[in-house]
Amino acid sequence: RDQTHEIVRTVSFAGDGSGRLPVPYGTEQTPPGEGAGQKIELPLRDAMVDRAFECWIHAGDIARAVDYPYDPPAPRHLHRMIDLAARMLPATLADRRRSGLAALSRDLVAAGAPGRSLRLEIEGEGGGEWFIALDSPGARASAEREVAHLALDGVEFCRLAAGHVSPAEAAAGRGGDREAVRDVLFAAASLSRL
């Protein structure tokens, strides 16, 4: 409710260029430690996509509970939801690493330099391909530094990001560095705690 209020408030005062304005989105609570209590902000455009994602997931939960058919969002909307989650993965990996929940960085590089990357292939409508920086959120993900590949269906990836499928249960094609694949699956699942 507070998130929705902040989104509407920001839009009503913003005017042109409002999609880039930051929207307060609560505080980091888990895992405890460094970073806990920090304010989370998302650009308005991303906050709207995140809110649409939450509404879709909750509506799907209700539909399943009453055995009512409920389709996923239109492909272009699903793509935006997947894109937001994929863009959040490098920072989430870094947070998990600082908390001891992910493997240590293997190859730190300067911000903007190409770093080790995982190719995330999302299949089905709304899918696409993203390269995820593994060792630093400031590194540039690239095909040349690909060390692992992870393929998931778009709806399955969203269910993983929503905490509705565990990383172990996610139906995924995997290749390359197993530790990197594992860390990305767990990072995706931890997005549900935002």
Per-range role (PLM):
Residues 13-194:
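Structured surface interface patches that mediate subunit assembly and partner/cofactor docking
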Residues 1-6:
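Short, helix-capping/interhelical loops that line the mouth of catalytic, cofactor-
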Residues 8-12:
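Long, well-ordered core segments of solenoidal/helical folds
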